[in-house]
A protein has these predicted regions:
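Short, amphipathic C-terminal "tail helix"
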Residues: 273-290
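Histidine (H) residue identity feature
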Residues: 18-20, 44, 49, 92, ...
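An N-terminal structural lobe/cap that precedes and organizes the functional/catalytic core
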Residues: 2-137
Length: 290
């Protein structure tokens, strides 16, 4: 089935002093946008009682001087004169409040990142769990998608390979370490540890990564939002309704399943890099000639 174009909003928040939030980076992201979707707890179906910010991810094509030349963008809007390669535009609206970049995201805040298509493809080809979600988001959570974005989404399978197994395992282990307070782990939600004895949000994400990783490695796709009954269980974990020992057991079981699938998933050993290269080439040429 061919996905539909969705003519929605490409407007992004104004630039800021963050290195990836210059006005030039924002202009590139807006003008070249091919896909913009909701990600995070909202699309997973694991948000609770309006506690979450809204996470969005986008993908954009770049002007020719940034691809075939050496053009760069300013490092934020602080006028330092430093320049960096354009790879993404990143903006949190919570930065606009007193406290700026040190503020913690909360309910009603927007967290948006728009990757260059080239960077997004590099990450997706490596099996990065976070960026892969963008091509599995259901239409009702798509903010914007043009013809180029349609072609990308309809070829999601080109990016899926056994390489994703190790990435999901790594992400899961990182979240598990944070939820249990292992050496080197850090939580920015001490109130959850105080009330529940562990960081319930890290725990929920660890288990979610396990469930979604297993689905990807066995079916080649990720269902969003998380199907029932797993979705309800994830919400229970996030609320702290599940004992730590039970959560750890569930996460470790999912981790063991991922490890077993790492060498026996049935997926291609490598993604279709050739198709991706051709898609990037023709998509940029079409954008530059329009």
């Amino acid at each position: 089935m061919v996905s539909a174009q969705i003519v929605g909003d490409t407007t992004l928040p104004a630039g800021f002093t963050h290195p990836h939030a210059s006005e030039q980076a924002r202009a590139i992201a807006e003008a070249g946008m091919i896909l913009r979707v909701q990600v995070g707890s909202g699309v997973h179906g694991t948000s609770i009682n309006g506690q979450d910010d809204r996470d969005e991810m986008g993908i954009c094509l770049e002007p020719p001087e940034y691809v075939t030349g050496l053009a760069r963008v300013p490092r934020g809007i602080d006028g330092s004169g430093d320049e960096i390669d354009f790879e993404q535009f990143q903006r949190h609206t919570v930065w606009d409040k007193p406290g700026g970049l040190d503020n913690r995201l909360g309910a009603g805040d927007l967290d948006v990142v728009v990757y260059s298509a080239r960077k997004w493809c590099r990450l997706a080809l490596a099996g990065n769990p976070t960026v892969l979600l963008a091509i599995f988001v259901p239409d009702e959570e798509v903010v914007y998608r043009n013809a180029c974005g349609v072609e990308l989404v309809d070829n999601a399978h080109r990016f899926v390979s056994a390489l994703a197994a190790q990435r999901f395992i790594g992400y899961l282990r990182s979240q598990k370490a944070a939820m249990t307070g292992e050496v080197g782990a850090h939580t920015n939600r001490p109130e959850l540890v105080t009330v529940h004895g562990y960081d319930t949000k890290f725990a929920m994400h660890a288990l979610r990564l396990g469930l979604q990783g297993v689905e990807l490695l066995t079916t080649g796709r990720i269902t969003l939002p998380v199907p029932e009954p797993q979705r309800t269980y994830l919400r229970q974990v996030r609320r702290g309704d599940v004992r730590l020992d039970e959560v750890v057991a569930e996460v470790e079981a999912a981790e063991a399943r991922l490890v077993s699938l790492r060498d026996d998933s049935g997926l291609p050993e490598r993604p279709d890099r050739r198709w991706v290269d051709e898609w990037l080439h023709r998509s940029h040429l079409a954008y530059w000639n329009q």
